[in-house]
Regions:
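Ferredoxin-reductase
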Residues: 2-15, 75-172, 369
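An N-terminal, well-structured beta->alpha segment
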Residues: 2-103, 128, 199, 207-237, ...
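Catalytic-core signal marking the mid-to-C-terminal active-site face
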Residues: 440-558
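Flexible hinge/switch segments at interdomain interfaces of large molecular machines
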Residues: 33-43, 195-198, 263-270, 523-524
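Phosphate-binding chemistry for phosphorylated carbohydrates and sugar-nucleotides
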Residues: 12-15, 20-27, 107-123, 131-132, ...
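Short beta-strand segments
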Residues: 83, 147-153, 313-316, 401, ...
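Metallocofactor- and cofactor-centric catalytic cores in central/energy metabolism, strongly enriched
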Residues: 57, 116, 121, 516-518
Length: 558
């Protein structure tokens, strides 16, 4: 269901009271006996809201202490790089974390400009720090760095988030996050006895070092993006940071590489009063959502396109991207991934390792599969979650990793790792490179792909379920699917493991020649998600979705 106010400008009633949100961060103490108030530390870290007693000072004290203990056990002896985004709760949590880290004797690197720090910038800082003298990546030995990013990503303004990046620079694997969460919950009830150094004292200590995140990241971008072709073409790129952490990075790119990137909306406002409402009636800073981006698109259609050839967007921590093209609007992330893959693997990155694959999540469009087959590139299909790309990117087994929720990263031009977390800045820059090199914008190139590979229709539907049903998903096997056809086509695969790495997908994927669906339970809500795609017709997609529910119900024994 799309909310009635989706795509409408935010009203005063939609805005948070920043003082209340920050005040409750400090004043409200969670009860460890209430499940909703405990630490839940997934691959995107711990997320919650001070208004719901799920993101408060106690949580951050306990989580940071757990991280300090974990890195000590793991032998991580180098600095910890810490950054924050523009959410109201991010600065208080950032300060709390520094107090605990310094009390634990951890060397902490903070931004020398006292600026916001995008997620990919922290990843890139960790990876370059951990690079050996011969240019290879180290993940064992003395002096290795790790990091923390304080962000709930594109979540609403009420929310806070706190995630840990180990020495591989990307989302921590489940065994690490589970250990941190378990220890944090042990500490939560007694958080006041955890040692801290008051912030003003901590930042003056020798343990807190200033690091120019912005300079370090931006100067290195020329090793990932072809700025020469962008500059010589005169492509006019606009960027909407959506009030997020990338806002001050684009002007430095102009300065360093003699570009003319225009920051469309440079304001930072923790209420995000300038946004249009997302599909569910909330303010959500998602650069791939046509509803959240409607204000920008309307202004472009009302004359602003005279200034730009294309516009890119990033979310609050700049790990997600959005691409907006004239006469098209916001591109579907699946479509943009397919365009990127054909461009990058089609001769424009000759320094990439031979045989390095294209990484995609199993709920991303099969258009990517068709493009990969046409250029004879290896496809590596993994479960949902960018954490599955960390090791393959780190080791150069994939040169590109992308997911349907507008997250991607790819290797440097010389084939070495760039980031192992999602990077929302380089896809925006790549869109300008692609336009400059091909003479067509990504939407036009997508239309060319549709002419060659066929048009597809894609949809995600959420279905209510129970905790008992959710538990059954993990135990499914292909044998639990008794159907032989889906939407009139013979079933060609019944998957409960991802073909690219044989990891359990926590659900089910069923494919035919021109259709597929995947079903998996939500990690945070009592719903299961069904993703589906058809290369036949919109009506066939509806049929796939209808039959998917029957297949899932029967497989679960309902």
């Amino acid at each position: 269901m799309v909310a009635n106010n989706a795509g409408m400008p935010a009203t005063p009633a939609d805005l948070i009271n920043v003082d209340e949100v920050i005040g409750k961060y400090y004043d409200v103490v969670p009860d460890p006996n209430v499940p909703e108030q405990r630490v839940s530390f997934g691959t995107s870290g711990h997320r919650g809201s001070s208004l719901k007693t799920s993101f408060n000072e106690a949580h951050i004290v306990a989580i940071t202490q757990a991280i300090a203990e974990y890195r000590k056990k793991a032998g991580v002896t180098g600095p910890l790089y810490i950054g924050r985004d523009t959410h109201a709760l991010s600065e208080p949590a950032w300060k709390t974390a520094i107090e605990v880290l310094v009390a634990n004797g951890v060397t902490v690197r903070i931004d020398s400009r006292d600026d916001f720090t995008p997620t990919p910038v922290v990843s890139q800082a960790i990876l370059t720090h951990n690079r050996a003298a011969d240019g290879t990546q180290r993940f064992t030995g003395e002096g290795l760095a790790d990091g923390i990013v304080v962000t709930p990503s594109h979540n609403p303004p009420t929310d806070g988030g706190f995630k840990y990046d180990p020495v591989t620079g990307g989302p921590a694997p489940s065994d690490v996050t589970n250990a941190i969460a378990d220890r944090a919950n042990e500490l939560l009830g007694d958080f006041k006895n955890i040692k801290r150094v008051p912030f003003e004292q901590a930042v003056k200590s020798d343990l807190v070092e200033r690091f120019d995140f912005r300079e370090h990241y931006v100067a290195d971008l020329e090793n990932v993006i072809d700025f020469d072709v962008i500059r010589s073409s005169g492509v006019r790129l606009g960027i909407d940071p959506l009030g997020g952490a990338s806002v001050n990075y684009w002007p430095l790119m102009n300065e360093k590489f003699n570009l003319t990137i225009d920051v469309v909306r440079p304001q930072v406002d923790p209420t995000w009063s300038f946004m249009t409402i997302d599909h569910d009636g909330k303010i959500r800073m998602d650069p791939s959502s046509p509803y959240a981006m409607k204000g920008l698109v309307d202004s472009l259609n009302n004359g602003a396109w005279d200034k730009y050839d294309l516009v890119g967007g990033t979310d609050p921590d700049a790990d997600r991207h959005g691409i907006v093209c004239p006469n098209w609007g916001v591109m579907n992330p699946n479509h943009y991934i397919a365009v990127c893959v054909e461009y990058l693997f089609g001769g424009n990155r000759p320094g990439w390792p031979e045989g390095a694959g294209i990484g995609k999540t199993l709920v991303s469009s099969s258009l990517i599969d068709r493009v990969a087959a046409s250029i004879d590139a290896k496809l590596v299909e993994v479960p949902v979650g960018f954490k599955w790309f960390v090791d393959p990117l780190f080791k150069g087994e994939v040169a590109f990793g992308g997911e349907e929720s507008s997250g991607m990263s790819f290797l440097r031009k010389d084939g070495r790792v760039w980031t192992t977390d999602k990077d929302g800045l380089i896809p925006d820059l790549l869109a300008a490179e692609i336009t400059a090199k091909t003479g067509k914008n990504p939407a036009q190139l997508h239309q060319d792909q549709v002419a060659r590979f066929g048009e597809s229709w894609y949809k995600r539907v959420d279905t209510p379920t129970t905790l008992e049903q959710k538990a059954k998903f993990a135990k499914l096997t292909g044998d639990d699917v008794t159907a032989t056809q889906l939407a009139g086509e013979d079933i060609t695969a019944k998957l409960t493991e991802a073909p690219g790495n044989h990891a359990k997908i926590g659900g089910l994927k069923v494919t035919t020649k021109d259709n597929w669906f995947a079903a998996r339970p939500s990690g945070t809500e009592n719903i299961y998600k069904v993703y589906a795609e058809s290369f036949v017709s919109p009506e066939a997609l509806d049929k796939v979705l209808d039959e998917a529910k029957l297949v899932v119900d029967k497989a679960l024994g309902e």
